[in-house]
Amino acid sequence: MTATISLEDFLRNVQRRDPDQPEFLQAVREVLTSLWPFLEKNPQYREYALLERLCEPDRVVQFRVSWTDDQGRTQVNRAFRIQHSKAIGPYKGGMRFHPSVNLSILKFLAFEQSFKNALTTLPMGGGKGGSDFDPKGKSDAEVMRFCQALVQELFRHIGPDTDVPAGDIGVGAREVGYMAGMMKKLSNSAACVFTGKGMSFGGSLMRPEATGYGVAYFAQEMLARKSEGFEGKRVSISGSGNVAQYAAEKALEMGAKVITLSDSGGTLVHEAGLSREQVLAVMELKNVQRGRLADFAARHGLTFLPGSRPWHVKTDIALPCATQNELDGEDAKTLVKNGVLCVAEGANMPSTLEAVDVFLAAGTLYAPGKASNAGGVATSGLEMSQNAMRLGWTAQEVDERLHAIMKDIHQNCVRYGERAQGAVNYVEGANIAGFVKLADAMLAQGVV
């Protein structure tokens, strides 16, 4: 990067190369906008085209997945693996199965993952993968055949010291198990190549809970700086998958009232607050029955708002845990108007750039996902460590390590994001802290 190029000129150069990748361009703009003033004060990070290199993945793998459905028909899906940066360690990031999956979404996720993994302080690079395969409505046998077909190509590109995938949207313990099983068969090795595995074959206690718990731990640290906490607060959560479920569980444990959950059909609202038993019932619904919140609401006499998002409901703490760009500028204005204290992202980039601007302008405590949802990948790193040492830690040990990591991430964000009167810009703090770790590693290793 030349000393005279402006931020807008740099972003135009990125857009010129990838004009049809809006999610990736959005992620790059969000990160670089907060990095630019830091770079102007620290010219050593303008050397060796560090930013240009970070805006270009090490490798993009795209391939066809052919599989047979229960009717004997051949189906074809597209799959990807984005290996973004191995400067700090092997590529690490989840696999997403959803019809919306495309190159832009996975490049944005891999880009964010490199910064997120750097924040954990664990030796992990960044990557992401997935397919436009939709597991909804598929039988277990169909999901198994698809996962096995996918790994027949993916296995060439992953390994315990090369690239270690995990789960994401549409990929839970079932899918990870099918992929890990085929990987073992093809590689003739039992090495840790996937994380998020079942406990019966090398998984870690607390891994399912880690992302959701981590979001709550991070929000707790943010609130503590304002002499606040979860006790007695109203919490709105979007989503009803793994992250949302355990964020709700931990929020209840901390004394909060969880008033919303959502899925693609709409939003479940319970003004009195969901009980622990109801949250456990949602886990059963989503993880085992694979049902819908609308049916759950009808059975339990709760309010369900079809086609609605949770952000119009008055709340103290908002935890967007569904998907990217689910919370827009108007949603953010509504939350601010209703007096929201804290927004901590459980999903990856769930807030649009406009929404982020609204939160920052209002002085709302706002944590970007690369910081607040890093607990999941951090615990994946702990799973890798346990596998390498051929041992397993107790749930309490893993939870204590997770809590300590989230505290460290928060402190790093404060270190780089603290402003006048003790206010913290967590967006700048997270982006700068992650960048410094990545950039120092890249500078030390030369132009490679």
Give the role of each language-model region.
Residues 195-198, 203-314:
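Glycine-rich phosphate/diphosphate-binding loop of Rossmann-like nucleotide-binding domains
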Residues 5, 19, 23-26, 30, ...:
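Conserved active-site and cofactor/substrate-binding residues in soluble primary-metabolism enzymes
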Residues 35, 106-109, 179, 215-223, ...:
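Buried hydrophobic packing segments
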Residues 162-166, 190-194, 237, 260-263, ...:
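General beta-strand structural signal in soluble alpha/beta enzymes
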Residues 2-27, 222-223, 336-448:
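Adenosine-phosphate binding glycine-rich loop
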